């Protein structure tokens, strides 16, 4: 399994812990000068033994948006599956899964101003390979087999409120507060640079303590 050091703990910790079960974990490290994940570095890690590559659509640390489509095609060509954490991207852009080509894509609806629910897309090919985690009579259902206790119907119904929120947000952003819209990108760039400085500092500390 290949993980990155650009990920949130949610999409790296659980995979890293599988090392205690005998899995080999490889780390795809960011370029410390840019904060980017470089495809050539991934290519050097991929071989016939790799089953899964996990990485973020957007780093919650630096805000770096990765070229998911290109990366997923590279992973698929190597014969592995991809798992993309979309939680930091989902509030800021539309994830077109038909273009991204991810085998697994996950995010949390509370990050898009909805209820505290996890949302997962999984391709049919991989779905068929995984065991049923729900009731035995749902074993053949691609959508129910991964919900052990059944869906939370009240939470699911409240997802509709996300649309109401975005309609109000659109009105607020594009009808009013033009000066704030001008300043926001400048603040985002400042935050990115501060995050990059922090990442470099942690890498230096890690190398010093190695």
Model-predicted regions and their roles:
Residues 2-210:
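Pyridoxal 5′-phosphate
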